[in-house]
Amino acid sequence: MSNELWGRKIEVIIRNKVLTYPELYIEFETNFDTEPIPDLGEVNIYNLSDNTLAEITLGDGIIVNAGYNDDIGSIFHGVISEIETTNEGVDTVTKIKMINVTQQYLNRYINFAYGAGANTKYLIRDMLDYAGGLKPNINNPTNNITYPRGFQATGKIKDVLTRVVEESGSRWLIHGSSISVIPKETGYTQGVYLDAKSGLMSVEKLEKQDGVSTHKIEMMLNHSIAPYSLLEVHAKNLDGIVMVVKGKHKSDFTTELEVRTL
């Protein structure tokens, strides 16, 4: 179906410049897994202006957000490791390779006084945005506390966020590029219900003799999916709870996963 029908959106943020789809044609593939090695990703952006191209350099911070309508979340935070611009027919294609450095964003310092009435969800969104345009994949604290006298945010952003999250009786999880705030009493990470009506496209049993993954899943893009996410899957050849081992988000708005049954 058309972009207008689905409301597909992509944001690529480089420094303070925001490049958006569908205004620009953008392709991406971002990878994630349970290994400690930083995740990698690639973005192709078509027909950038000469001025914009001149402003993009190696080592620049880059964030990729994707989703539908108002439900947009980060699928990659990192730095640019390679840039190449080529001509393909009448188009100019800028190919950008990225490496994940979410923790560097969260180690930035903040010194800001929020006014009376600020609440937990707003503080989380605003501080992640201040960190470099980050967005929470899940922002569902146990208690959305209102601070009637305001809130003083001073220190490393990750330390201030930890305080806000703990005061709300919640927990926050960072898996690669995914940042989620969830109720403390939920499982290791919030589960996602998945069947044909909610975005499941296919399930394939894997025959790996020495691997931890048992099944491969293809689904509509869901920016909240990350390593260790729990999925409640209902399909003909898989019915039950699985844990995400690795996967990728793609610009055809699919998420491909390898999972293991629990």
Predicted feature locations:
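Surface-exposed cap/loop segments at beta↔alpha junctions
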Residues: 48-132
